[in-house]
Structure formats: C-alpha cells, structure tokens
Amino acid sequence: MRLALAAVLVLALAGCGSDETGNDAASTTPPATVTVTETETVSAEPEVTCSTAGLRLTLPEQELPAEVADVRKRVFDAAVACDYDTLEEIALEQGAGFTFTYGGETDASDYWARLEEEGTQKPMRALATILTLPYTRNESGSYAWPTAYSERPTDEAWQALVDAGLYTQEQIDQMKTAGSYLGWRTAITADGDWQFFVAGD
C-alpha cells in the first residue's frame, strides 16, 4: 500500500514539473517582428541625351604627326562621351586663345553643354564626325577637319559632309552659294595645340 502511494506522489510531482517547463518555454518565446517599408518619392531630373548617343564611329588612322594624332584621338574620345570639361582642358593645355564661338560666351564647356541641351545644334556629334573625315592644311599650316574647310573645296569634300549626315544637300548648296564652308570645323597645330572648334563666321 505504501509503495502504491509513493508511486502516485512521484507521478504527481513529475506532472507539476512538466507544466512549469511548458510555462517557462511559452514565456520565453520572442514576439513576432513586423517590418514596415516606407516608399520615398524622388522627383527625377530631366535627362539630357548626348547627340553622340547611338552614334557608331571609328576613328581611322591618318598620316599625322604624333602630337596631332594624340590630340585628335583625345578630342574624339571626349566628344563621343560628351565630356565637355575634358574638351575644355585639352583646349587650354597650351594656353588661352582657343576659339569656340564668335559670340560673347567665355566658357567653352558651358557653351557646348547648352547647345546640346537645346538640341538645335549638335556640336559633339559634329566634332566626332568631322574628325573621322580626311583632313586638310589651313592657311597657318595646321591640320584641319573637314577638307571642305579650304579655299577651294572639291565636290568630294562637300559630298562627304552629306554622306556623314552632318548637313543636308540644301545646306551644302547654301554654303556653296555663300562661297565658303561655314559649318563646324576644327584644327590642331603641328605641335599638338588644339586651336578651335567653331561654326559660322
């Protein structure tokens, strides 16, 4: 009889111990985590597309002095990238005197950026394109592009501008009537000084 009572007491105590363990486990269960995501609306700035975007040009090798070839390549790469600041740095490497407009503007990079943004003219596309065309020598002996920029441009020189997509035949005819090429042109001296990139007169 005593053995039976002892067994009942042991089972009762064991049952109490298991309830406490369950309560302890329940009390230590971490609370559920709630994540709240906030969405911030940012107004996007209008994107200005460079006129060379999508333009596939290869700069052909030309028989030029090393200094001229180097500057030509650097100018071409910067023009394709619409890197106005680098272009201005190249323009001023050998001092002031670089011509980029016949107006009153004083900052070349700002001027080119404004023209690109307005979209009425495409100076970077023009610069990259004319540097892929044959060159000529201007009155000061500098290496100049395109060949239409000469005293007596040939029909082939005029046609090259149309084929390159820089000007329409009507625009070329107007320049011929005016007596000279007044489009975008550029020149580099024999010692590698980038002299100008300009249009008009």
Can you name each region flagged by the protein language model?
Residues 17-29, 46-73, 88-201:
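C-terminal-biased regions
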Residues 30-44:
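Serine/threonine-rich low-complexity intrinsically disordered regions
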Residues 1-4:
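Bacterial N-terminal signal peptides that target proteins for export
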Residues 12-15:
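C-terminal motif of bacterial Sec signal peptides marking the signal peptidase cleavage site
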Residues 75-87:
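Short helix-adjacent coil turns
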